[in-house]
Amino acid sequence: RQDRIYINPEERINYIFNSSIKGIENSDLILLVGSNPRLEASILNARIRKAYLKNNTKIYSIGDPGDLTYPYEVIGSNTTIVKLIAAGSHEISEKIKKSKKPIIIIGESALYGEAGRYIFETIKKFLFTNNFIRDDWNALNVLTQQASRVGAIDLGLYSIAKNENFPFFDKLDNGSFKFIYLLGADDINFQKDDKFIVYQGSHGDKGAEIADIVLPGAAYTEKNGLFVNLEGKIQNAYKASYPPGDAREDWKIIKDLSKMLKKTEDYKDIHELQKNIKKNITIKNNNNLKNTKIVEFIEKEISIKPIDYYFTNSIARSSKTMNECRRVKKKFLFTGIEKAS
């Protein structure tokens, strides 16, 4: 993670889109929680629109995302609404209970900070109690904004203490670290001060600018690899061209660093590495115990954070086309995304 987004890695259903994108069309009720799917996942938003047009699916939102291209009802914008839903004292509670295939989509804006834990765990418990987390239909869905987030959680690349979800960020803020290794991490905010920073990545973005050492890596188009999508499915990515200059594939850089540090690896080549990754994900996928937690209430506004649509990653920020799109967009006071007043 590069931000304080709450994650519960205990079981895989906690951080993927369980209902599936295709399953949206079968839903009879959709509740958005701190999410703007039009900007965060345009294809997913198109499916929601299709569900509305085809099935007249009712759509509700906690937080106001603006124009989503289909009608919806804002039922509130704070964690009190979540509390009322869980207690069964909000009118939407009964509508969810009476629906056959409801979908709850929790966005990163709702998961930010300590309140994110309350929102997620409370909604999960409500759905589990009402039998909406089962093998044939799981209404719990997390909409991530980072393409690598699901895969990173699958591999255990996170820092979580027993009773603390953000120990890494706390240490980062108080200056506990003297050495930081940024693996393609360009959106993490901290003061460099006297920290020694190594950056490994494909584009000379924010991370490279503050680094003491840069290890040039291959872009996703310049290497074979695996991606885990929103639904938790593993997808293969194939090399379209070779990396320029001294740039190398990420796994080769890490393997050489391991040798220098005299650390042993359980793989010899990329095929063995990918085999181990798939095995690890399969084990985690079969470990869904459907655990629920009771979390102390935290009152907080659920405001949907704006997205710099054309500048969401380092590759987009280095694109001349994306820069031009961003420049043109800034000229318009009304973009079509906002609601007309």
Task: Report each predicted region and the residues it spans.
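Non-catalytic alpha/beta scaffold blocks inside enzyme catalytic domains
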Residues: 2-290, 333-341
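Long, low-complexity segments enriched in small/aliphatic residues
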Residues: 274-341
